């Protein structure tokens, strides 16, 4: 679990470096021009089980990320939900530390394209079978 938390903190630091801030961040705390937001989802209570750990909106494009530390395994419900999100036309990823650079490339495409295009769908397809798997089909 510590490995996943460390990876989550690394991801948050990267997101803020490109202008994706925690939802509700005050403008005067933003060090680069904002292009989106993220929110961390917490399990339990009134939350729906199996939702990805983080929800991001970058240039209007929704991205959901299920983080796993080294050796972590997604539940069947998590895999089902990721597939359903992708089949709905959004982007959902199962992200391991070894897939972080692939994730950054996907983010670069989202930031540069500013639209959900064929190129972004190709990036989703290219991520399959890596540490940054989109889990389609």
Task: Give each language-model segment a name.
Residues 1-137:
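Catalytic phosphate/metal-binding cores of nucleic-acid and nucleotide-processing enzymes, i.e., regions
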């Amino acid at each position: 679990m510590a490995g996943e938390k460390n990876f989550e903190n690394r991801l948050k630091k990267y997101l803020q470096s490109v202008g994706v801030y925690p939802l509700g961040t005050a403008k005067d705390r933003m060090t680069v021009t904002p292009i989106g937001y993220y929110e961390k989802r917490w399990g339990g209570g009134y939350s729906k089980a199996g939702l990805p750990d983080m929800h991001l909106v970058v240039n209007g494009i929704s991205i959901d990320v299920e983080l796993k530390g080294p050796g972590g395994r997604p539940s069947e419900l998590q895999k089902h939900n990721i597939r359903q999100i992708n089949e709905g036309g959004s982007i959902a990823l199962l992200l391991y530390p070894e897939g972080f650079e692939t994730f950054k490339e996907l983010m670069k495409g989202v930031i540069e394209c500013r639209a959900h295009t064929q190129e972004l769908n190709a990036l989703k397809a290219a991520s399959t079978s890596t540490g940054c798997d989109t889990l389609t089909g």
